[in-house]
Amino acid sequence: MNVDLESLAEATSGAIGSLISTTILYPLDTCKTKYQAEARSSGRTKYRNLTDVLLEAISNRQVLSLYQGLGTKNLQSFISQFVYFYGYSYFKRLYLEKSGYKSIGTKANLVIAAAAGACTAIATQPLDTASSRMQTSEFGKSKGLLKTLTEGNWSDAFDGLSISLLLTSNPAIQYTVFDQLKQRALKNKQDNADKGTSPASLSAFMAFLLGAISKSIATCLTYPAIRCKVIIQAADSAEETSKTKIKSQKTVLSVLYGIWKREGILGYFKGLHAQILKTVLSSALLLMIKEKISASTWVLILALKRYLLLPRGKVKNL
C-alpha cells in the first residue's frame, strides 16, 4: 500500500503552522471578531476601533478573556488546515498525474484550491461557529464548546455554511498567488539543486512577504462576505433576550440589508484594516512555518528511505 507522503507532509506542516500562528495572534483575532460583529446591535456604536475592545477587557480586568475560545479555535484551525493542505496537495498531485503536465496552471490551481476549501468548510463548520460565538460573548461569560454547540438545534451549528463555501475563494486566491510567486522565486534555486538533495526552500522572510501579499489580495476581494459570516455566527452568543431578532439575522440577505440600512456601503468594509492585519500576519506566519517544516520533512523522508528501505517510487519529492 503506497503512502502519500507528499500530501501527508503538506498537511502536517500546514496544520502545525496554523496552530502556532493562531495561538500567537489570538487576542488580536478576538478584538477583530468582536469589532466586526457589532453590526448585530442597533443604535449606538460601542467600539470605534480595535483599541476600544482591548481597553474594555483591561478596564473590566478580563484580559485573559481575550483568549476565550482559544482551545476551540486551535482545534478548528488545526483540523481545517490539515484537511485543506492534504486535500490541496492530493488534488494537485492527482491532477498532474491524470493530465500529464509537469506544472499546474493558474485556473486549475484555483479550482483545486476551491475544492479543498469546500471540503474543509463542511468538515469544520460547527467548530468555526462555536469559536465565533465564544469570542463574541461578553468578556468572562464565554461558555464551553459542548454547551455552545448544544444551545440550539444541530442546524444552528452550521450557521454561515453557505458563506463559508463562498469564502473558499479566499484561500483559493491566496494560495494560487502564493504558489505562482513561490515558483518564480525558487526557479533558479531548483535548477541549481543537486539530485538527491533537499529541494530549495524559501527563506523565512521571503515566505512571510509572499504570504502577506497573497493574503492581502484575497482578503480585499472577499471581505464583505467575511463580515457577513461573522455577524451571522455571532448572533446567538450575545443578546439572547430576543429570539425573533436573532432569527431574522440568520439569513445572508437580511444581514446584508441590515448593514446597508445602518452603515451604508462603507459598512460592508468595516473592520477591513483589522481583518487584513490579523489575516496577513496569521497567513504569513503559517506559510513561513510551513515552509521550514516542509524542508525538515524532506530530510526525514530521506532518512526513512535509507534506514527503512522504502521503495524509491513511494517517496515523492517534497
Curated annotation (Swiss-Prot):
GO cellular component: peroxisomal membrane; peroxisome
InterPro entries, alphabetized: Mit_carrier, Mitochondrial_sb/sol_carrier, Mt_carrier_dom_sf, Peroxisomal_Ade_carrier
GO BP annotations listed: ADP transport; ATP transport; fatty acid beta-oxidation; peroxisome organization; seedling development
Recorded family membership: Belongs to the mitochondrial carrier (TC 2.A.29) family.
Localization annotation: Peroxisome membrane
Topology with respect to the bilayer: Multi-pass membrane protein
Repeat region (Solcar), residues: 5-94, 104-184, 202-296
Function comment: Peroxisomal adenine nucleotide transporter catalyzing the counterexchange of ATP with AMP. ATP is needed by reactions that generate acyl-CoA for peroxisomal fatty acid beta-oxidation during postgerminative growth. Required for the conversion of seed-reserved triacylglycerols into sucrose that is necessary for growth before the onset of photosynthesis.
Keywords from the UniProt entry: Antiport, Membrane, Peroxisome, Repeat, Transmembrane, Transmembrane helix, Transport
Native organism taxonomy: Eukaryota, Viridiplantae, Streptophyta, Embryophyta, Tracheophyta
Induction entry: Down-regulated upon illumination in seedlings germinated in the dark.
Protein name (database record): Peroxisomal adenine nucleotide carrier 1
GO MF annotations, alphabetized: ADP transmembrane transporter activity; antiporter activity; ATP transmembrane transporter activity
Positions in coiled-coil regions: none
Species of the source: Glycine max
One Pfam family recorded for the sequence: Mito_carr
